[in-house]
Amino acid sequence: SDAHSLFHYFLTGIISSNGKQFRIPPHEWGLVVIFQNYLKNLQTIWDSSELQKAIQLKIQDDNVECDIQVKKLPDFQKDIFHSIISGKTSPEVKKLAQTILRNEQESFINLSPKYWAKDISEKVFILHGLNDSMVPFTESIQLAGYLPNTELCVSCLLEHKEISLNGGFFFNFKELFKLLQFHAKLFSHYEN
């Protein structure tokens, strides 16, 4: 729910909650989204337009054209591209991302609920997967803390776009019950 914590997660895979640290390998699309949206604003001593084009082709799932575009890039830009696309941050990508974070501070303040969520008076229901690698669960915990009227459910059964049933029968049953309670509150709220 704020740019600093998300950038830290995308660059390290480490998240913190209640004084504990967790390591969840970040989904590669986190870096892709950052560079897709902000690389064009970054002043570099090299032209980033061809790298931007390669990233855009990857997003469009045009793998043939993307491969052709990547082959045209200078070696250091190929390394940057592969680091971004793989989600494994090289020192250069880390440096670029940190520069983006500094340069885009105003934009990130406008996007970060940390600065405006307190103004939302309606009840907000947040459901998040504990092992979501796109956006870590700690962001939902922070968001729930910023909102004045919220119901939060973090479930071990949910991952990004997937359901995980790796916990054993009783654990899964307990998690399903927690999800049912959350949904009951949600439906009850909107029935009234």
Question: What are the residue ranges of the model-derived segments?
Answer:
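Short alpha-helix in the alpha/beta-hydrolase fold that links the catalytic acid
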Residues: E122, P136-G145
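Short beta-strand/loop motif that positions the catalytic acidic residue
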Residues: D119-I120, I126-H128, D132
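Catalytic histidine neighborhood in serine/cysteine hydrolases
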Residues: L147-L165
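Catalytic active-site module of serine/aspartate enzymes centered on a nucleophile-bearing elbow/loop
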Residues: I163-N192
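Flexible internal linker/loop segments at domain or repeat junctions
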Residues: I68-E104
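Active-site nucleophile elbow and catalytic-triad environment of alpha/beta-hydrolase enzymes
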Residues: T99-W116
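Conserved alpha/beta-hydrolase "acid-adjacent" motif
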Residues: F108-I109, S133-E139
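Alpha/beta-hydrolase-fold enzymes
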Residues: S1-K78
